[in-house]
Amino acid sequence: MLTELVAERIELGMDNIPSALNFIREGKIRAIGVTGARRSAVLPDVPTVAEQGMPGFEATAWFGVLAPAATPAAIIARLGAELDAIGKEAEFRSRIAGFGAEPPGLTPDGGSSPESFGVFLRAEIARWTDVVRRADIRVE
């Protein structure tokens, strides 16, 4: 989609910031709004969609680490602790922020845990299930 937008074969598109950031910085496309709850640290002058008249609008991309359901609790705890430690490292946070991604932050200390991710994941599933149901979206 971005190549079509840069080539002006389409007039509007939506993509995530890391994918579009270089095109924005080079002036090849213009960012109109961000879909998160707050402005992006790498695009602070670009207002949120909610700020532009659609209150409550929020749609973001996120990544998570998942394991098979039968994975022993001790392994999940160890993986969670290691991932949380990495997510709090200044170098990691700086590196992903540099290409427009936002670091994890599901717990009060700015980290994450298997439990906090589980809460987040269940909320996302419920939220998007409701959107699909209300919009009567069907698989074709």
Where does each model-flagged region fall?
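Conserved, function-defining micro-sites of small-solute handling proteins
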Residues: 1-140
